[in-house]
UniProtKB/Swiss-Prot annotation:
One of its GO terms (molecular function) is ATP binding. Belongs to the amidase family. GatA subfamily. This is Glutamyl-tRNA(Gln) amidotransferase subunit A. It comes from the Bacteria. Pfam families: Amidase. It comes from Rickettsia africae (strain ESF-5). GO terms for cellular component: glutamyl-tRNA(Gln) amidotransferase complex. HAMAP family: GatA (MF_00120). NCBIfam families: gatA. The active site is at residues 78, 158, 182. Allows the formation of correctly charged Gln-tRNA(Gln) through the transamidation of misacylated Glu-tRNA(Gln) in organisms which lack glutaminyl-tRNA synthetase. The reaction takes place in the presence of glutamine and ATP through an activated gamma-phospho-Glu-tRNA(Gln). It is an enzyme of class 6 (ligase). The lineage of its organism: Bacteria, Pseudomonadati, Pseudomonadota, Alphaproteobacteria, Rickettsiales.
Length: 493
């Protein structure tokens, strides 16, 4: 029998319904795995007591035939989802001891469906990063190793703790947030399915903000079916979020295994990527195109002429919004306060923020403050907003001809911890392929599609039309079936 912590969400639900095991046993297996792999630093706060209580309640519901859709299923939450009475820090010193008195809508939705929370996962500070190396709790180590090297690898970011938890069988699923690729890129690096829904599909209420016009809750799972199950539970209109979309939550599970006949898949002729793409990524992309052709899809050449400006646009708009959102952390209302005798209010602000924020967060606040200044507004911010509109228009034009778009998720496989740290611009290019869809607010997923020559997982990205999560899952499921001969599992696990 498969170890309980290695079961997918779908198989766990089936086993619990058949009474093959209890939720208490399932949760116990995951707790044991978490304790065994503390060195990966995936979790920053455990909620084992809560999880065991929730599991006990789930077992009672199964006994009484009152089980909900996620009854007894273990999940983890990125540490920017506020959890009532449970520490929520965004992995920043400025919020290191913050305990919210309210629950985020997304975690509440999962609790309402019977989900069991194992804990809060590590992340880049305030979700700013691509390698999970800016957390005040230390970096996360990927469960994966290259087959020619034993060096520790990054899990991707900013949702690296969630990716490591699911990839390392320390959770069946895990919540992340995706602003410019923070679910999709870690999913690619760790051999997982990572899904970012349409902007507004999942409520942002109770999510600690980075860039409000881009932030969206996402999910990590080990199968496309699991992704559809979790998305159905997470999504839905929320009057507490002004950007929430008033649309029915679709039935998504029927997308799994659907025919690709008459599906048109767009492949961009160029994104101006040059030599940044590793050869392994190019081969995986071409192999996936052939896979979809053989499955009955029609491949259509498309152009996204403004996508090449995506990274530049993102690193104007996102820091601008961050500088505004993070201005609330001033040492007065909540979070860290640094003070000394005879200190003025301005000095207290300065000391608190300079002590509480890490270097990358301070860098982005400064960039954002500048582009919103009188000298930067016209030169940078307003121009970036105009180009953002052009990027969205490019997608609209493409989707007049195709049902989905296929791109690599990241230009490289996972890299060693410590690499690319000295030059922020090199790190920013990790999001080269994920940012354009974020700027347009589109649903997209990364699904494992191959292994590099060094044995590391490579993800392919599927981008769909607004509110068309169904077709994204349909294409992802076809790719998953086509590469089922590849085992996307870290060797030591």
């Amino acid at each position: 029998m498969t170890e309980l912590n290695k079961l997918t969400v779908a198989d766990s639900i089936k086993g619990l319904k058949n009474k093959d095991f209890t939720s208490t046993e399932l949760i116990g297996a995951h707790i044991k795995q978490i304790e065994k792999h503390r060195n990966l630093n995936a979790y920053v706060t455990d909620t084992f007591d809560l999880a065991l209580k929730q599991a006990e309640a789930a077992d009672q519901n199964y006994a009484q035939n009152n089980a909900r859709t996620l009854e007894g299923i273990p999940f983890a939450a990125k540490d920017l989802f506020c959890t009532k009475g449970i520490r929520t820090t965004a992995c920043s010193n400025i919020l290191k001891n913050f305990i919210p008195n309210y629950e985020s809508s997304v975690t509440q939705n999962i609790f309402d469906k019977g989900g069991v929370m194992l804990g809060k996962t590590n992340m880049d500070e305030f979700a700013m990063g691509s390698a999970n190396i800016t957390s005040c709790f230390g970096n996360v180590i990927s469960p994966w190793k290259a087959n020619d090297d034993n060096a520790d690898l990054v899990p991707g970011g900013s949702s690296g703790g969630s990716a490591a938890a699911v990839s390392g069988f320390m959770a069946s699923a895990a919540l992340g947030s995706d602003t410019g690729g923070s679910v999709r890129q870690p999913a690619s690096f760790t051999g997982l399915v990572g899904f970012k829904p349409t902007y507004g599909r999942c409520s942002r209420y109770g999510m600690i903000s980075f860039a409000s016009s881009l932030d969206q809750a996402g999910i990590f799972t080990r199968s496309v079916l699991d992704s559809s199950i979790m998305l159905e539970a997470m999504m839905g209109f929320d009057e507490k979020d002004s950007t929430s979309i008033k649309a029915e939550v679709p039935e998504l599970q029927s997308a799994i295994g659907s025919s690709m006949k008459n599906m048109k898949i767009g492949v961009p002729l160029s994104l101006g990527e040059g030599s940044i793409i590793e050869p392994d990524i190019m081969k995986m992309w071409q192999d996936t195109i052939e896979l979809l052709k053989n499955a009955g899809a029609e491949i259509v050449d498309i152009t996204l002429p403004h996508a090449k400006y995506g990274v530049a646009v993102y690193y104007v708009i996102a820091p601008a919004e961050a500088s505004s959102n993070l201005s609330r952390y001033d040492g007065v209302r909540y979070g860290l306060r640094v003070e000394r005798e005879n200190m003025t209010l301005d000095e207290m602000y300065e000391m608190t923020r300079s002590t509480g924020f890490g270097e990358e967060v301070k860098r982005r606040i400064m960039i954002g403050t500048y582009v919103l200044s009188s000298s930067g507004m016209d030169a940078y911010y307003l121009k970036a907003q105009k180009v953002r509109r052009l990027v969205a228009n490019d997608f609209n034009n493409a989707f007049a001809k195709v049902d989905a778009i296929l791109l690599p998720t990241a230009p490289t496989a996972a890299f060693k911890i410590g690499e690319k740290q000295n030059d922020p611009t090199i790190m920013y290019l990790n999001d080269l392929f994920t940012i354009p869809a974020s700027l347009a607010g589109l649903p997209c997923a990364s699904v494992p599609a191959g292994l590099s020559a060094r044995g590391l997982p490579l993800g392919i990205q599927i981008i769909g039309k607004q509110l068309d999560e169904y077709n994204v899952l349909k294409v992802a499921s076809t790719i998953e079936s086509g590469v089922k001969h590849i085992k996307f599992e870290p060797k030591v696990f």
